[in-house]
Amino acid sequence: MNSKGLTLTIIFKAQSLNYGEGIGNISELKKLARGNGNVYTFASRQALRYDIARIGNKLYNWNLEVVDKEKGTIQFKDELNIKDSQEMDLFGYMKTSKKSAENEDGGSETRSAAVRLSHALSLEEYKSDMDFLTNKGLADRIDEFPNLANVEQHLSYYTYTVTVELA
C-alpha cells in the first residue's frame, strides 16, 4: 500500500505556553533537558490538540459534546463515530468495554489518528526567568497582606510538526 501524507513544520514566536503542576506558589513551565544540560520549554502535543479542538469548536462549530463517563472512565461516547465528531475523525480514539454477558471478551474499539502532532519545542534555551506577582493593590484597599506568586516566563521561537495522513 502506498500511503500519502502531508507534513508541515511550523515555527512561531510565543511566551510561556504550557504550565505543569507547579510547587507551592510557583507556576512551572513544562521543560526538558538535553544531554548537554541545556533546558528548553515546550507545549505538549496534548495541549496543541486541545487547542485545535477548542478553536475548531469556536470558529467552525465542531461538536465537542462527544464524551461521557458512562463506563467509569472519561472517553468518547459509544454511539458516536467520525461522522459525529471532527475531533474523533482527525485525532482518532480508543473506546474500551468491560467484560459483560453481551460482551464476553471486553476489549476496545480504536481508530488511528489521521493527524499527528509533535510537542512544540522552544528553539532558544530557557534561562530561568521568573515573574514575581502580587495583588498588593487589592490588598491595600482592605488593609491585608498581599498574596504572592512566582511564574516562570520564557519568550522564544517554538517549532512543532503536524503530519496528516491523506489516504
Predicted ranges, named:
Residues 1-167:
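RNA-binding basic/glycine-rich loop and surface signature characteristic of RAMP-family CRISPR effectors
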